[in-house]
Amino acid sequence: MSMQEKIMRELHVKPSIDPKQEIEDRVNFLKQYVKKTGAKGFVLGISGGQDSTLAGRLAQLAVESIREEGGDAQFIAVRLPHGTQQDEDDAQLALKFIKPDKSWKFDIKSTVSAFSDQYQQETGDQLTDFNKGNVKARTRMIAQYAIGGQEGLLVLGTDHAAEAVTGFFTKYGDGGADLLPLTGLTKRQGRTLLKELGAPERLYLKEPTADLLDEKPQQSDETELGISYDEIDDYLEGKEVSAKVSEALEKRYSMTEHKRQVPASMFDDWWK
């Protein structure tokens, strides 16, 4: 088995998908999981990007189906901007498409600034822009878990195969969640699900960005990764890619294994 085949298997990627079936399966997964846990629904941060838009709409479909069957569940979509978000219009368009039961907003800027200032006061050192970006992501995780704990909701994550293979998420930030409805999907497969769901093109054709850096606002994921999502998706779907792309992805996959595992102990061997 090649490394490419191994990664495809470990990340549960299918070379091709039936969008309607994927939507049904993922909505059913959400329904079954929330019923099993006894939770009252889901909470998810909505950025206006493809991934949170898709996960949010799947969550809303799941809770509506539960209610139609006589159950009780809700979905809270939460906006978590750091000050003024440049693509706020996209976030509002995403909310209009998702149609969540509730939509709340918490601006994380004051929290992040307070910690950054205290860090500098205590250490004499200023947080790097990259490290501060991770603080933003982890602050958003704290907010979602606060809502989840208060309302009895499960926190959804938006990680998918193209992020998982590159480790392109913040550990205990956007990587902190109770369940992941997009697992196994490549970026382009996620787009096909949004098309099937009737999402506005603007939400899945826009350039993906984590938008965590103050010094490089709206920097694209592909610029930061140095690889295009088409190349990542081709690799994950079992297609032939250049040796350079294969080597880069396999190196990233190995280096970021710790992000896909629970914290290591002396009884684990995945890190050896």
Curated annotation (Swiss-Prot):
Quote the EC number: 6.3.1.5
The keyword Coiled coil is annotated on this UniProt entry: no
Thermal profile of function: Optimum temperature is 40-45 degrees Celsius.
Source superkingdom: Bacteria
Q: How does it assemble?
A: Homodimer.
Which family, according to the similarity comment? Belongs to the NAD synthetase family.
Name of protein: NH(3)-dependent NAD(+) synthetase
UniProt source species? Bacillus subtilis (strain 168)
What would be the name of the gene that encodes this protein? nadE
